[in-house]
């Protein structure tokens, strides 16, 4: 990668540096470079998913950002994790699905509002608020009555972000 030029996707692929691929995928001056960067990240989707289990905060953040940039292929994997994974992986999946703001994640996120883990319920409510889909109104209204006050508060915040959402009412 040159100091002032566009990111070198081929070099990033050859070295396996995810961070350089991410830099290329988010390069705004040349759509072809950005697309090549996204394609390189998509090829490493399994690695990115596995990195969600790391304790290295920097690698975790790079993996999260990369998965969001990859888009629909990563979304499908994250939706699966949201329904089947370990609770910490589910929490990560809920967070990233919210960052993606993809309507296809609304139903699985609504389902996770009923999970036993309060942090997962809270992150799912936040994600639904970021997506802003009217399809989440009823589940979020029910979540406003959650036994955990933090979950209920996040559900109310999410409802305020969705057109037609009236906080504090059950529908």
Protein language model regions, located:
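Structural detector for internal amphipathic alpha-helices that build alpha-solenoid repeat scaffolds
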Residues: 1-15, 20-53, 57-72, 77-83, ...
């Amino acid at each position: 990668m040159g100091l002032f030029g566009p990111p070198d996707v081929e070099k990033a692929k050859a070295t396996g540096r995810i961070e350089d691929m991410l830099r290329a995928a988010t390069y705004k001056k040349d759509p072809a470079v950005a697309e090549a960067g996204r394609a390189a990240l998509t090829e490493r989707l399994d690695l990115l998913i596995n990195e969600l289990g790391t304790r290295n905060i920097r690698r975790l953040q790079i993996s999260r950002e990369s998965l969001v940039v990859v888009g629909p292929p990563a979304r499908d994997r994250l939706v699966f994790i949201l329904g089947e994974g370990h609770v910490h992986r589910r929490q990560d999946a809920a967070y990233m699905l919210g960052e993606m703001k993809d309507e296809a994640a609304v139903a699985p996120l609504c389902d996770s509002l009923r999970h036993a883990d309060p942090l997962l319920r809270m992150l799912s409510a936040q994600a639904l608020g970021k997506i802003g889909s009217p399809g989440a109104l009823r589940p979020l209204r029910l979540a406003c009555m959650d036994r955990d006050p933090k979950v209920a508060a996040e559900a109310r915040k999410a409802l305020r972000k969705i057109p037609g959402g009236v906080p504090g009412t059950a529908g």
